[in-house]
């Protein structure tokens, strides 16, 4: 990322956990990562832990059902061909395959522990 590309475009805020981080790009083709095309529109920032311009972190994306901005944390969202916030996953649980339902049940059990 050049100087212009590394400047924050705004602040990403997860509508569930309130994680708040400046982002430098929103979309599917991160700058300087010419061979990478993401499966969803994502809020992205340059990876602060490496000088490599091609490295980036995905902060989150809009839920494909309700459009809430959610982070990629397991407490907030799940990716199954698209990003879904956990409240939508729970609300539409039966619409997901058994493997995803089991994953959701595991997360709920871990949350209670």
Swiss-Prot record:
Q: Which domain of life is it from?
A: Eukaryota
Q: Which InterPro entries match?
A: CDPF1, CDPF1_dom
**One matching Pfam family, short form?**
C6_DPF
Q: Which family does it belong to?
A: Belongs to the CDPF1 family.
Q: What is this protein called?
A: Cysteine-rich DPF motif domain-containing protein 1
Q: Which organism is it from?
A: Xenopus laevis (African clawed frog)
């Amino acid at each position: 990322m050049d100087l212009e590309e590394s400047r924050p475009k705004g602040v990403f805020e997860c509508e569930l956990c309130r994680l708040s981080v400046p982002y430098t790009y929103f979309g599917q083709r991160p700058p300087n990562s010419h061979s990478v095309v993401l499966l969803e529109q994502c809020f992205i920032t340059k990876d602060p832990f490496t000088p490599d311009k091609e490295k980036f972190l995905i902060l989150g994306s809009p839920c494909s059902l309700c459009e809430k901005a959610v982070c990629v944390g397991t407490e907030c969202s799940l990716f199954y061909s698209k990003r879904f916030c956990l409240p939508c996953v729970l609300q539409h649980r039966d619409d997901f395959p058994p493997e995803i339902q089991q994953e959701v049940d595991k997360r709920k059990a871990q949350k209670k522990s």
